[in-house]
Amino acid sequence: MTKPSLILIGGGGHCKSCIDVIEQENKFLIAGIVDINRFISELLGYPLLGNDDDLAKLKLNYDYALITIGQIKTPAIRIRLLDYAKSLGFKLPAIISPRAYVSKHAKIGNGTIIMHDALINAGVIVGDNCIINTKSLIEHDAVIENNCHISTGAIINGGAIIKQGSFVGSNAATKESIKTNEKDLIKAGSLFKGYANE
């Protein structure tokens, strides 16, 4: 059976990591990359297909896309591109590394990527357009809302709620059952204990 083709929207460093996961998952063929940088012609052997303005034309030939721009300070660009891709009719699949563990009792949203060696336990809900990065741990019953980035080695303990648009830095950890604010930024290496009014 022929694998469907997938367009990657965004051609930076995060895109390289996404390419490796997509190749390992082996469910999609990468058609190429869409990026505003006209100075690149390819990335890891995949061609540049155009920029954001070409997506409507590309939709005539391709059904699937993934947002492959990273997220640190703000999710705004990822959200804008997601909304645009959806408005054109692209399907945005969840991509899960075969080296990750995702419980059969967890739920993963559309357009989310689960990177190598991530661990997602039972009862977890991960929303749409999220990055669950390499070696991160999402413990039982935690909720990661839409458009979040859980960075490399971060630990989200049981029952925690990471509100939409938030970023949890590398090797940061949360206490159990806490709740962040929307678009929160938890610094790398820190322990987030929640807010005083919880």
Where do the PLM segments sit?
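Structural signal for interior beta-strand "rungs" in well-ordered beta-sheet cores
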Residues: 94-198
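Small/polar loops that bind or transfer phosphate-bearing groups
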Residues: 10, 69, 176
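Short amphipathic alpha-helical segments
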Residues: 19-21, 78-81, 126, 198
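Hydrophobic, well-ordered beta-alpha structural blocks that scaffold small-molecule cofactor pockets
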Residues: 1-43, 56-59
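Phosphate-bearing ligand-interacting subdomains
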Residues: 40-97, 101
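Conserved acidic residues
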Residues: 31, 63, 164
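Glycine-rich, phosphate-binding/catalytic loops in enzymes
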Residues: 25, 82-85, 148
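Short alpha-helical
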Residues: 13-14, 73-76, 107
